[in-house]
């Protein structure tokens, strides 16, 4: 999978999780974005079940922002086909989130959660290149 480190960092900073970003590798930034989205999806599901409409709308909005951050972080120059497929998947997820928000549809949230978990598992299986570099090399990442 291909992502731009700068875009991922700005997207993650925009959701208020600055503490872990400072020293994180680009690989870790994407993991943090995905973890943040999954945490908020679980929160939104509970808010729908408790009829917390205002909170649910805000939480789903944050998930949409995170997924947009993942989408704009894609590096289309590295693998055009994969990045286009991921962009289409992120667009689909956001459309499902909008439907979930409008209709209080827990099944749409569950679908997005499942898709994002699958992506995160694939991403987590990719070794972080900074683990294999010497200290002098990590500064260039």
PLM regions and their residue ranges:
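N-terminal intrinsically disordered, cationic/polar leader segments
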Residues: 1-43, 47-50, 55-61, 68, ...
């Amino acid at each position: 999978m291909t992502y731009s480190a700068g875009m991922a960092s700005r997207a993650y900073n925009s959701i208020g999780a600055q503490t872990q970003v400072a020293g994180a590798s680009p690989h870790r930034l994407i993991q943090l974005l995905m973890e943040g989205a999954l945490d908020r999806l679980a929160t939104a599901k509970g808010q729908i079940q408790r009829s917390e409409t205002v909170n649910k709308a805000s939480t789903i909005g944050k998930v949409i922002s995170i997924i947009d951050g993942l989408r704009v972080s894609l590096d289309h120059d590295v693998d055009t086909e994969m990045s286009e497929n991921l962009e289409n998947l992120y667009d689909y997820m956001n459309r499902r989130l909008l439907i979930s928000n409008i209709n209080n549809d827990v099944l749409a949230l569950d679908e997005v959660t499942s898709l994002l978990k699958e992506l995160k598992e694939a991403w987590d299986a990719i070794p972080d290149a900074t683990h294999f570099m010497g200290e002098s090399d990590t500064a260039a990442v």
